[in-house]
């Protein structure tokens, strides 16, 4: 596994429409790509990554919401200075790595939900985006087997966000022209300050 470079705006490759993974491409190279994508996403850290974000124009995306495991025993973190201050407990993260190859939304819901989205390719910029609250997705796994699944909540939103990447669309493209310009200006200022 290897951590790959994540493309950031204004890299023109992010506007590329990704190609489907062909039947003869379900092989060790694809498995390596997926492994690298997970490692890259976790290192960033993020909850979703499309192959085009690491420069590979294929219809592959990975998601792991990394939600707290509320069924597990809380773990202590921080440093206790003997006075009870500083140490606190948190729930360990429950990893649920998901792989979607050649995903296709076949039944988007008309009811919308709003999430504040961010993107590893548009670092440190967040904005509210409206998307269908639920959707049905058809996709393939690493073996090429086809699955169909109903998604809702953050998973549905994340999937739709990552699927936009496969079409060369960034979450800021859903914003008004003014909000998009403001976001890009803020990103430019942050880069100049760094």
Swiss-Prot record:
Highest taxon of source: Bacteria
Active site, per annotation: 162
Reactions the enzyme catalyzes: N-terminal N-formyl-L-methionyl-[peptide] + H2O = N-terminal L-methionyl-[peptide] + formate
S-S pairs: none
Gene Ontology terms: biological process: co-translational protein modification; translation
Alphabetized InterPro entries for the sequence: Peptide_deformylase, Peptide_deformylase_sf
GO molecular function: metal ion binding; peptide deformylase activity
Note on cofactor: Binds 1 Fe(2+) ion.
Requisite cofactors: Fe(2+)
Feature: compositional bias, Basic and acidic residues: 76-93
Record carries keyword Iron: yes
Record key words, sorted: Hydrolase, Iron, Metal-binding, Protein biosynthesis
Known EC number: 3.5.1.88
Uppermost EC category: hydrolase
Binding site for Fe cation: 119, 161, 165
Gene3D superfamilies, A to Z: Peptide deformylase (3.90.45.10)
Region (Disordered): 71-93
Claim: Transport is one of the keywords in the record: no
HAMAP family, A to Z: Pep_deformylase
Job of this protein: Removes the formyl group from the N-terminal Met of newly synthesized proteins. Requires at least a dipeptide for an efficient rate of reaction. N-terminal L-methionine is a prerequisite for activity but the enzyme has broad specificity at other positions.
Family the entry assigns: Belongs to the polypeptide deformylase family.
Protein name: Peptide deformylase
Source organism of this protein record: Erythrobacter litoralis (strain HTCC2594)
The encoding gene: def
